Amino acid sequence: MDTHVRGTIRGAIDLMRIGNAVAAGVLTFTGAFVAGGFAVTTAHVTGAVAATIFATAAGNAINDYFDRAIDKINRPMRPIPRGAISERGAIVFSGFLFVAAVVSTSVLPLIAIVLALMNLLALVAYTELFKGLPGVGNAIVAYLTGSTFLFGAAAIGRITDFGVVVLFILAALATATREIIKDIEDLDGDRKEGLQTLPIVIGVTPAYRVATGVLLVAVIASIVPYVIGIFGIWYLTLVVPADMIMLIGVWQAPDNPTQGQQLLKRGMFVAAAAFVVGRAVVVAGI
C-alpha cells in the first residue's frame, strides 16, 4: 500500500473521529439500559448503537467539510485542511456513512426510526443553516447529543422513561455549556468567517455567564432522580462527583477553554455512569 493511499485511509479515519462516534454509541446503549435494565432486546439495541456510531461519524465528516475554511485557522491539522482527504472525498465518505446509519435503523421500532430521521434533519439544518447563529447552533448540538440517550430508549420502546428523560436534559445542558465554551475558544476563526456565534454577538464574558447558568440548571436536574426516589444513594455517590467535575470545568474555562471542555465531557460520562449504576442497583434489588 503506497503512502498516498495510507494517508487517505488515515484521513478518512480521522474524519470520522472514531472516539467520539463510539462514545455516542455507548451513550445510546446507556439510554437503553437506563430505560430497560437487563431486559433489553439485543437486535434492537445493537441496531441503535450501530446507527448512532455511523450517524455520528457521518456528521463529523460533513461538519468538517462545511468547516474546512474555518479549520484552516482554528484546527489546521484536521484531515481536509492538511490535505489528507479531498473535499469531494469527504462528501462521498459521509454519504456512505449516512447510508450505513439508515440501514442500521431497519431493525428498530417506528418511534426510533422517526427519531433518527428527525436527528438527521437537525444535523443537516445545523451544518447548512444554523451553525453560525447565536445560541441556535449550540442548542441543536446539545439536543443531538442528549438525544443519543432517547434513541437508545426508543429502540426498546421506552422513550418516555423518566430516568432517560432526565439524562437527556442533563446531557443536553452540559453539551450546550461545552459548545458555548468551544465558541469562545474558536472566537478568532469564527469572526474571520463572519459567523455570529454567541460570544461574538453578546461578548465573551456574557457568553461565559450564560454557559455557567446553563450548567447550574443541569446540576440541579441531576439531583432530581434521587430526590423523587427513582434512584438511590449509589446514584448520588456518582452523580455528585460528576457535577463537581463539570463545575470545575466551567470554572477553568475562561483561562483554559480546552481543559474546561475536556472536564465537561468527562463529567458528562461520569454522570451517564451514575444513571447506569442507579438502574443496575434498582434491577438487582440492592
UniProtKB/Swiss-Prot annotation:
EC number annotated for this UniProt entry: 2.5.1.42
Main location: membrane
Pathway listed: Membrane lipid metabolism; glycerophospholipid metabolism
GO molecular function: geranylgeranylglycerol-phosphate geranylgeranyltransferase activity; magnesium ion binding
Family annotation (Pfam families): UbiA (PF01040)
Listed name of the protein: Digeranylgeranylglyceryl phosphate synthase
Keywords from the named record: Cell membrane, Lipid biosynthesis, Lipid metabolism, Magnesium, Membrane, Phospholipid biosynthesis, Phospholipid metabolism, Transferase, Transmembrane, Transmembrane helix
Known function: Prenyltransferase that catalyzes the transfer of the geranylgeranyl moiety of geranylgeranyl diphosphate (GGPP) to the C2 hydroxyl of (S)-3-O-geranylgeranylglyceryl phosphate (GGGP). This reaction is the second ether-bond-formation step in the biosynthesis of archaeal membrane lipids.
Named cofactor requirement(s): Mg(2+)
Gene3D superfamilies, sorted: UbiA prenyltransferase (1.20.120.1780)
CDD domains xref list: PT_UbiA_DGGGPS
Organism: Haloquadratum walsbyi (strain DSM 16790 / HBSQ001)
GO biological process: glycerophospholipid biosynthetic process
First-tier enzyme category under EC: transferase
Reactions the enzyme catalyzes: sn-3-O-(geranylgeranyl)glycerol 1-phosphate + (2E,6E,10E)-geranylgeranyl diphosphate = 2,3-bis-O-(geranylgeranyl)-sn-glycerol 1-phosphate + diphosphate
GO cellular component, one term: plasma membrane
Ranges that cross the membrane: 21-41, 42-62, 96-116, 133-155, 162-181, 214-234, 235-255, 266-286
Membrane topology: Multi-pass membrane protein
